[in-house]
Each structure stands twice: as structure tokens, then as C-alpha cells.
């Protein structure tokens, strides 16, 4: 016999012995024993055995028996008779009966009576009564609901703890930048209540707690709570656990949890499975999961189907799926649809979709609108869209704003945008920023080739080098010229050669000059010929 089986056997024997003791006492006329025995039989589901014991105890004035008799009658479908016994017990001071009576009245639409009895229960410290009162008050928008929800949570009601946490989360989000602490206090308290509810087995609280911990970088604990919630049947937690595992490099385990979540109707997990199979080249399986995501109400499924069809050259089907997602409000699908329409020459049809996507917050669509208007020669309108995209962090848009500001003579504003674009990785922006800074420098003293000169690199040189290292040919030529000016023949030759081999005529010509000065005239001639 396993220890757990032995423990259960011992517990069962103790319960049986206790029942015998209570039955003997009840048969001897002990009212409390009648009440306790009736409650034991009621919990076991023996309604026929429980009813005479509870009726006898109730007749003798036992309020707990009256409450339990109400529960028994309610289970048998005699709701009105049950309410009568609950009223007797509630008037005698039973908080549990007051709660049951309050719920009875609410189910029948009598809210004033429901509130009266639920308040009686809550004010006696009954957790279920406090929660039911809070729910009633919240339903009609009464601000007092929060007080009773908190009271129920403090008395151990897990759903109350969860709902209190959700309310605090909403307060933290609403407070945002307007509050003294940006909602930090509410968010911290919300986490505490999520933790309490999750510890009591609330699966959604465990999900939200996991999300908070993941956002904070506490991935191990986040994973534990996601796992707890997922095992209890929360599909969103299974999906989130899958993403954690994928990010940790365990794609196979991630797929197991995504499959579990997707089979339970989670569209996000179905999309993740679709993407996984698409990466493996299993397009038919990917398409099946994207369709499952769409059927689950996740509009990303239609968007991903569009992407899949576009990659396979199925343009008509791609357009169909993009349209479906775009009409459902998917901004990136609207942008993708506009690009597809542009590619087939329908600029008129593309513009409204770019606009719709941009207005919905698509940064790429705002940039694409800039390109569209610039192509029509509407520079002022194009600049407005570029500025909008640049303000949201779009690197190429920031470059275009920088170029426009340079053209307008607004060098400080141009420099600001070029710095943003260059910092975002644009080699063209790095080169143009370097030229702006270069123009401000006083001319450096000339040096003979081969003469070693040690100077601290200026900021403009650093930007030239960054652009050059990213393959920008004009930057490579300029870095070569700066190296030559310092007398560093080897470095100059390296950069000229890189530019020349990438097709730069200036790079080829300068490399030829350098080689000729070094006495390598035959090779110099080759590069001059290439320079044309």
C-alpha cells in the first residue's frame, strides 16, 4: 500500500468513526449532532439521509441546519422553500444563509432584496457574501464595489483577488504618465493580488503573473507560473510558455505547448505553429495552422496566409487574404495590400490602403506614403509622412527628412534627423552626417604620403568609417582620402580598393594615383582603365 493510499484509508476510517459518533448522539436527541450529521451526509451527496437530520435540528432552532436544509432543497429544485429556510437562518444571524438568500433574490431579478441580504452577509465578514455584493455593485457601476471586492480578497476569495488585481491594472494603465508615480503603486499592488490568487489555483491570475514576471525579465519564475496555468487548462498560458521556450532555443518543446494551446482554440498559438512550419518549408502544414488561427478569430491568420501566398507567387490569393485581414483592421495587412497593388501598377488603389494603415499606426505605411507622394513630386506632403514615420523611429524616414532639411538649408534639424537615421544603422545617413560635420572642420595640414602622423579621429571621420564599414562606396573613398592625408598609405589603399572593387570609379582612380606614386604603374594603369 502506497503512503497516499494508507493516508486516505486512515482518513476514511476516521470519517466513518466520526459519523457513527454523531449518529449515536443524534439518536440520543443531541441537536448539534443532528446538524453536524446532516451536514456530513449533505457533503457526501446523501440527500435522503441528510434531510430528516437537518429538519429535526432546524425544528429545534439550529441556524446552521436551517442554512444546510436550504442548500439541500435548492439542490432538489425547491428554490422557494430553500429561500424560506435561508431567511430563517439569516434572521438568526447566519452569514452563509444571508449570502445564499441574497444570491437567490439576484437570480430572480430582485436587486434591492439581493443587496440587503448580501450586505448582511458581507458585514459579518463572510468572503462569499462580500464578493457577491461587490459583483452586484460593480454590475451597476457603484464605486463601493471596490471596497467589498478588496474585503473579499483579504478574506481569501481567489476570484475577488484576481478581479481586484485586474482593476488595479486598469487604474495603473489609466494613470500612465499623468500620475505622480506613473501607476507604479497600483501595478505593484496588482502583482501582489495576482500572486495571491494564483497561489490559490486561479489559472488566469497565474497567466497574468507570468506575463508581469516575463516583462520584468524574471523568465524562470514566469515560466513556472505559465506552466501552472497551462496545466490547469489556460490556453493563453500554454501559448506564452511556448514563446518562452522558443526564445530559450527549445523549439521542439515550444511546439508541444503551441499545439496544446492551438487545439484549445488559441489563435496566437496556431499562428506560431504556422510560422514554425513555414520556416521549415512545410507550407501545406503552415497554411493549415494559419487557417486554424483565422477560424479562431485571430486576424493575423489571414495576414500570414497572405504573406505565404505572396512568397509562393500566388498574387491573387495573397491579395484576397490581405484584403480580408485589412478589412478586419489589420494595419500591416493594409500596408502589404497597398504594396501589392503598387507592384501591379494600381497606385490609385494603393493610396487609400496606405492611408488606412498609417492612420492605424503602421510606421512602414507612413513611410510608404512618403515615397508615393515624393514620386508624384508632392514634396511637402511626402515630408509630412516621412516626419511622422521618423518620429516613430523609422530609420529610412529619418534619412529622408534629413535630406529634405539639408535641401531647405535647415542644417541643425537635418543633423538631428541624420543622427537618428545613422544611429539606426543607415550607411547613407552616416555618410551624409559625416559630410555635414566635415564641412565645419578647419582644413587639416598636408602631409607627405608615408609620413606617419598620429591625430585623434574627429567625429566626422568616425561616421565616415561607420558608413564605409557598411559598404558605402563614397564613404570608403572618403576614408581612403583621409588616410592618405594622414600619410597612411596602407589604410588608404585598402579603402580605395574596397570601393573600386564595389564599382566606384573614384575609388579606382584614387587607387591608381596612389599606386603610381608608389611606383606600381602597371597596376595603376589597370585601375585607371577601370575608372574609365
Regions found by a protein language model. Give the residues of each.
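TPR/TPR-like (Sel1-like) alpha-helical repeat modules
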Residues: 121-124, 154, 327, 391, ...
Amino acid at each position: 500500500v502506497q503512503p497516499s493510499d494508507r493516508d486516505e484509508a486512515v482518513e476514511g476510517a476516521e470519517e466513518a468513526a466520526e459519523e457513527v459518533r454523531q449518529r449515536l448522539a443524534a439518536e440520543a436527541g443531541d441537536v448539534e449532532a443532528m446538524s453536524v450529521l446532516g451536514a456530513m451526509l449533505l457533503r457526501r451527496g446523501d440527500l435522503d439521509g441528510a434531510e430528516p437530520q437537518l429538519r429535526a435540528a432546524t425544528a429545534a432552532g439550529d441556524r446552521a441546519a436551517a442554512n444546510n436544509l436550504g442548500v439541500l432543497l435548492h439542490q432538489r429544485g425547491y428554490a422557494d422553500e430553500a429561500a424560506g429556510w435561508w431567511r430563517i437562518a439569516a434572521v438568526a444571524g447566519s452569514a452563509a444563509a444571508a449570502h445564499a438568500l441574497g444570491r437567490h433574490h439576484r437570480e430572480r431579478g430582485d436587486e434591492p432584496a439581493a443587496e440587503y441580504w448580501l450586505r448582511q452577509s458581507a458585514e459579518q465578514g463572510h468572503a462569499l457574501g462580500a464578493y457577491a455584493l461587490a459583483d452586484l455593485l460593480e454590475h451597476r457601476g457603484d464605486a463601493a464595489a471596490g471596497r467589498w471586492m478588496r474585503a473579499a480578497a483579504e478574506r481569501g476569495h481567489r476570484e475577488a483577488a484576481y478581479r481586484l488585481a485586474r482593476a488595479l491594472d486598469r487604474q495603473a494603465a489609466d494613470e500612465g504618465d499623468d500620475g505622480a508615480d506613473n501607476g507604479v503603486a497600483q501595478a505593484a499592488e496588482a502583482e501582489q493580488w495576482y500572486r495571491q490568487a494564483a497561489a490559490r489555483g486561479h489559472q488566469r491570475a497565474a497567466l497574468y503573473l507570468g506575463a508581469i514576471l516575463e516583462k520584468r525579465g524574471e523568465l524562470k519564475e514566469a515560466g513556472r507560473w505559465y506552466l501552472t496555468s497551462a496545466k490547469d487548462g489556460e490556453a493563453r498560458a500554454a501559448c506564452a510558455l511556448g514563446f518562452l521556450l522558443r526564445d530559450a532555443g527549445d523549439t521542439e518543446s515550444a511546439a508541444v505547448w503551441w499545439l496544446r494551446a492551438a487545439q484549445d482554440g488559441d489563435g496566437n498559438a496556431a499562428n506560431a505553429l504556422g510560422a514554425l512550419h513555414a520556416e521549415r518549408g512545410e507550407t501545406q502544414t503552415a497554411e493549415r495552422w494559419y487557417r486554424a488561427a483565422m477560424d479562431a478569430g485571430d486576424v493575423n491568420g489571414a495576414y500570414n496566409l497572405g504573406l505565404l501566398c505572396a512568397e509562393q507567387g500566388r498574387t491573387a490569393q495573397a491579395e484576397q487574404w490581405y484584403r480580408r485581414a485589412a478589412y478586419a483592421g489589420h494595419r500591416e495587412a493594409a500596408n502589404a495590400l497597398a504594396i501589392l497593388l503598387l507592384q501591379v501598377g494600381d497606385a490609385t488603389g494603393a493610396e487609400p490602403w496606405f492611408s488606412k494603415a498609417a492612420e492605424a499606426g503602421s510606421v512602414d505605411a507612413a513611410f510608404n506614403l512618403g515615397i508615393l507622394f515624393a514620386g508624384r513630386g508632392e514634396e511637402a506632403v511626402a515630408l509630412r509622412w516621412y516626419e511622422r514615420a521618423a518620429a516613430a523611429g523609422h530609420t529610412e524616414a529619418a534619412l529622408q527628412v534629413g535630406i529634405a532639411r539639408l535641401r531647405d538649408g535647415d542644417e541643425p534639424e537635418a543633423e538631428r534627423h541624420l543622427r537618428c537615421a545613422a544611429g539606426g544603422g543607415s550607411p547613407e545617413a552616416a555618410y551624409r552626417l559625416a559630410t555635414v560635420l566635415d564641412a565645419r572642420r578647419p582644413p587639416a595640414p598636408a602631409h607627405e604620403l608615408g609620413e606617419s602622423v598620429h591625430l585623434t579621429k574627429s567625429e566626422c571621420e568616425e561616421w565616415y568609417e561607420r558608413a564605409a564599414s557598411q559598404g558605402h562606396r563614397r564613404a570608403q573613398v572618403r576614408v581612403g582620402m583621409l588616410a592618405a592625408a594622414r600619410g597612411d598609405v596602407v589604410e588608404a589603399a585598402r579603402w580605395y580598393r574596397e570601393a573600386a572593387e564595389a564599382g566606384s570609379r573614384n575609388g579606382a582612380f584614387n587607387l591608381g594615383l596612389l599606386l603610381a606614386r608608389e611606383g606600381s604603374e602597371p597596376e595603376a594603369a589597370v585601375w585607371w582603365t577601370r575608372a574609365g
